[in-house]
C-alpha cells in the first residue's frame, strides 16, 4: 500500500527513507490495528523494536506517511540519538518539536538545568499538544527517560517510536518486534537492487543469500551493493562469501569492542583516544549509558559490511571513515570535502558512490538543495575502529580542524549575505561550496543549526581545537540572530561553550562576559534566581581580571534580579554598589539609570525621602548630559512619587 502524499506546500520533517521498499505487510497491519485502539487517557504510543539493520526507521516512516492525512495538525519528527549513540536530552528534542509545531519561542525554550518532565520545554510541548491531533515520530529512543517527558495527556495525538531495546516504564505498550523479511520480500528487495534477471535466474542462490543475511534489510542491501560492484559474481558466490569466515578489515576490532570503547572512554584499553568522537566520555554510574548499539561480529550485518568495505577504492574507504567525524555523522559536499581535503566535485561523487553501495543513507536535501548523507548508526562503531587503526591521530585532528575552519567560513559568508553592511566576504569559498542568496544563507543557518552546535560541542569536548571552536562560536553568535529565528536555547548553549573554554584556558575576562550573557538570557525570560547565580559568578571572574565595567554590569544584574524577586532591600544595596563603581568610571548615563533604579527600590521600601533625593540626583546628571527625554521621564516618576506620598498622608490622617 503506497503512503499518502504530504499536503501540497507543507514542509516534510520526515527522513527520506529508502527508494525501494518491500515486505512488512504483517507489521504494518499490526501497527494500523494498534493505532485505532481507544487511547487510555493519554496519547497513544506505538513502539517498533528491532536490532540494528532491521529497518525499523524506514518502517516507521512509511507507516507515519500512510496516516499523515488523519492528523490535520501536523506530523512532527525528532531523532533522539545520533549514530554515535549520543543521547538527545528530552528538553532539546521538545524544543525542536515545538519549532516544527509553530510554537513561539519563549521562556520554555530556555533550559533550566532540570531534566525530565519538569523541563520547561517538555511542559510547553505537552501544553501545545493539548486539543490537537498531531502525529509524532520519535526515532531511535534509547530509554524511557527520553520518551516519558514528551508524552502528553492528549488522546487525539499518536506517538510512534523506534528503539533497539525494551522501553521499560512506559505503560500499555505492545511493541511490534521486527525480525527478518519473509522470503518473497527478501527476493523482491534483491531483485530491485541488483537487477531482476540476475536474481530471477538464480532463485536458489537468492534464497541462500537471504538466509545468510538472516533476511535483514540492511545486510541484504549491503550484499546487493557488493553484487553490483561484482558483476561477474553469481548470487551463490555472494552467499558463499558471506557464510565463509572472512578476515576483518585491517586493524578492525569487533563492533562490540567499539561500543565498549565509546562508552568507556576511547580505545578498549580504557585510555583516552585522540582520534575523534571516541574520546573519553564516561557516564556516571546512575546515568543512561550513551554509545552505539553494538553489532556482534557474528551478525550477518558485520560480515556484509566487511565484504563491501574491502572492495572499496582507497579514497572512498578513507572518506567513509572520516565521515564518522562529521557532526551527527551527517555530511554534504561542503563538510565531506573539508574532512578529506579534496575538491568539492570529488567529494560529491564519492558520497554518491557510497550511497549507491548502501554504505550511506541519503537524507532530505539542505535548504539550498545540497544533497546530504548520513553514516548509518548500524555501521558507526565499526567505522570508528577502522578509522582508529588506519588513520594517524594527527591526520584525524587535521581533518577536524579543516572541518571547523570550513564551517567558520560558511557561517561568516552567510552573515555577510544576511547583513550586507558588514562588508564583502574577504575570503570567498570555491563556487560549488558557496551560499548565493540571503534566503539560502538564512535557510542554511536554521536548517544546519543543530549540526553547527554539535560541531562546536564535539571540538570543545575534546579540548584540542579550542581556537577553531571559539571562532565558530563567535561566528554563530553574530549570524544566528540575523535569521530572526535564533532560539534563546541555542544562544544559551553557545555562551555555555564560551564559558567552558574560558574557564579551561584560565581567561577570567572571557568567562565573565559569557556569564553575563547567560544571566541576561535567563533574566529576559524571568528565570531570576538562575540569572542571579550567573551574575554573581560573573562578578567573581570580573574581579579576578580587574574588569571594572563587567563588575558594574554584574552588580546591576544581581540588583535587577533582587528587585524582580521582591527584595527591595537587597536590590537597593546592589544598586548602590553598582552606582559607586559607575561613578568612579565616569559613566554618567549608567549613573543616572542606577540612581533612578535606587530610587525605585527606596520607594518599594516606603523610604520616600531617599527616593526623592535619588530621583533629583538622577535629574541633575541628565541635565548635564542634555538628555531632555530622560529628564521628562524622571519628572513623571517624581510626580508619581509625590502623589503616592500625598496618598499616604491622607490615609494616615483619616485613620
Place the predicted regions along the sequence by residue:
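Walker A/P-loop phosphate-binding element recognition
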Residues: 1-139, 155-163, 174-179, 186, ...
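C-terminal boundary/linker of central alpha/beta nucleotide-binding cores
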Residues: 61, 161, 203-206, 309-406, ...
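Amphipathic alpha-helical segments of the small helical/lid subdomains adjacent to P-loop NTPase cores
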Residues: 150, 179-222, 236-237
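Loop-to-helix "switch" segment enriched in basic
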Residues: 169, 226-317, 425-426
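A eukaryote-biased feature capturing mid-to-C-terminal, repeat/solenoid-rich segments of large proteins
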Residues: 229-244, 255, 384-427, 445, ...
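Short, well-ordered secondary-structure microsegments
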Residues: 319-326, 410, 424, 428-501
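Residue register of alpha-helical TPR repeats
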Residues: 374, 471, 510-515, 553, ...
Amino acid at each position: 500500500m503506497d503512503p499518502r502524499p504530504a499536503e501540497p506546500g507543507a514542509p516534510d520533517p520526515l527522513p527520506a527513507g529508502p527508494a525501494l521498499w518491500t515486505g512488512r505487510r504483517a507489521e504494518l497491519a499490526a501497527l494500523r490495528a494498534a493505532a485505532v485502539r481507544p487511547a487510555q487517557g493519554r496519547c497513544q504510543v506505538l513502539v517498533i523494536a528491532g536490532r540494528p539493520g532491521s529497518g525499523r526507521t524506514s518502517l516507521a516512516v512509511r507507516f507515519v506517511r500512510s496516516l499523515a492525512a488523519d492528523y490535520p495538525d501536523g506530523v512532527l519528527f525528532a531523532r533522539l540519538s545520533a549514530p554515535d549513540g549520543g543521547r538527545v536530552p528530552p528538553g532539546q528534542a521538545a524544543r525542536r518539536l515545538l519549532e516544527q509545531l509553530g510554537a513561539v519561542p519563549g521562556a520554555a525554550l530556555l533550559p533550566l538545568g532540570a531534566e525530565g518532565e519538569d523541563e520547561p520545554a517538555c511542559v510547553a510541548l505537552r501544553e501545545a499538544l493539548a486539543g490537537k491531533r498531531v502525529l509524532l515520530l520519535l526515532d531511535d529512543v534509547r530509554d524511557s527517560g527520553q520518551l516519558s517527558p514528551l508524552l502528553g495527556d492528549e488522546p487525539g495525538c499518536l506517538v510512534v517510536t523506534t528503539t533497539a531495546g525494551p522501553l521499560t516504564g512506559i505503560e500499555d505498550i505492545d511493541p511490534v518486534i521486527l525480525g527478518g523479511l519473509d522470503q518473497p520480500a527478501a527476493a523482491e528487495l534483491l531483485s530491485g537492487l541488483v537487477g531482476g534477471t540476475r536474481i530471477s535466474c538464480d532463485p536458489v542462490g537468492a534464497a541462500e543469500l537471504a538466509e545468510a543475511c538472516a533476511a535483514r534489510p540492511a545486510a541484504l542491501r549491503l550484499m546487493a551493493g557488493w553484487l553490483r560492484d561484482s558483476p561477474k559474481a553469481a548470487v551463490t558466490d555472494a552467499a558463499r562469501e558471506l557464510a565463509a569466515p572472512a578476515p576483518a578489515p585491517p586493524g578492525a576490532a569487533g563492533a562490540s569492542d567499539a561500543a565498549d570503547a565509546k562508552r568507556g572512554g576511547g580505545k578498549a584499553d580504557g585510555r583516552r583516544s585522540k582520534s575523534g568522537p571516541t574520546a573519553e566520555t564516561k557516564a556516571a554510574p546512575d546515568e543512561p549509558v550513551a554509545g552505539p548499539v553494538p553489532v556482534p561480529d557474528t551478525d550477518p550485518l558485520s560480515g556484509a559490511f566487511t565484504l563491501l568495505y574491502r572492495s572499496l577504492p582507497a579514497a572512498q574507504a578513507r572518506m567513509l571513515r572520516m565521515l564518522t567525524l562529521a557532526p551527527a555523522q551527517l555530511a554534504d559536499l561542503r563538510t565531506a570535502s573539508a574532512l578529506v581535503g579534496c575538491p568539492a566535485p570529488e567529494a560529491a561523487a564519492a558520497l554518491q558512490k557510497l550511497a549507491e553501495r548502501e554504505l550511506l543513507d541519503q537524507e532530505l536535501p539542505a535548504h539550498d538543495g545540497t544533497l546530504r548523507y548520513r553514516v548509518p548508526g548500524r555501521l558507526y562503531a565499526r567505522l570508528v575502529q577502522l578509522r582508529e587503526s588506519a588513520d594517524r591521530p594527527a591526520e584525524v585532528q587535521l581533518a577536524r580542524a579543516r572541518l571547523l575552519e570550513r564551517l567558520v567560513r560558511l557561517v561568516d559568508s552567510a552573515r555577510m549575505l544576511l547583513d550586507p553592511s558588514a562588508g564583502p566576504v574577504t575570503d570567498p569559498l570555491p563556487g560549488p561550496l558557496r551560499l548565493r542568496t540571503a534566503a539560502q544563507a538564512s535557510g542554511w543557518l536554521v536548517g544546519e543549526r543543530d549540526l553547527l552546535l554539535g560541531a562546536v560541542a564535539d571540538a570543545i569536548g575534546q579540548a584540542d581545537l579550542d581556537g577553531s571552536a571559539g571562532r565558530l562560536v563567535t561566528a554563530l553568535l553574530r549570524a544566528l540572530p540575523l535569521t530572526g529565528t535564533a532560539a534563546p536555547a541555542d544562544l544559551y548553549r553557545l555562551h555555555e561553550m564560551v564559558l567552558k573554554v574560558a574557564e579551561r584556558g584560565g581567561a577570567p575576562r572571557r568567562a565573565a562576559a559569557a556569564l553575563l550573557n547567560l544571566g541576561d538570557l535567563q533574566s529576559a525570560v524571568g528565570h531570576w534566581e538562575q540569572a542571579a547565580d550567573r551574575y554573581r559568578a560573573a562578578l567573581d571572574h570580573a574581579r579576578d581580571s580587574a574588569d571594572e565595567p563587567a563588575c558594574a554590569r554584574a552588580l546591576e544584574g544581581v540588583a535587577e534580579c533582587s528587585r524582580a524577586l521582591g527584595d527591595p532591600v537587597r536590590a537597593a544595596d546592589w544598586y548602590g554598589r553598582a552606582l559607586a563603581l559607575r561613578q568612579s568610571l565616569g559613566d554618567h548615563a549608567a549613573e543616572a539609570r542606577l540612581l533612578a533604579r535606587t530610587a525605585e527600590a527606596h520607594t518599594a521600601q516606603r523610604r520616600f525621602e531617599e527616593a526623592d533625593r535619588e530621583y533629583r540626583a538622577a535629574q541633575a546628571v541628565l541635565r548635564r548630559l542634555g538628555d531632555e527625554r530622560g529628564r521628562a521621564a524622571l519628572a513623571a516618576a517624581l510626580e508619581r512619587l509625590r502623589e503616592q506620598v500625598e496618598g499616604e498622608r491622607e490615609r494616615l490622617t483619616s485613620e
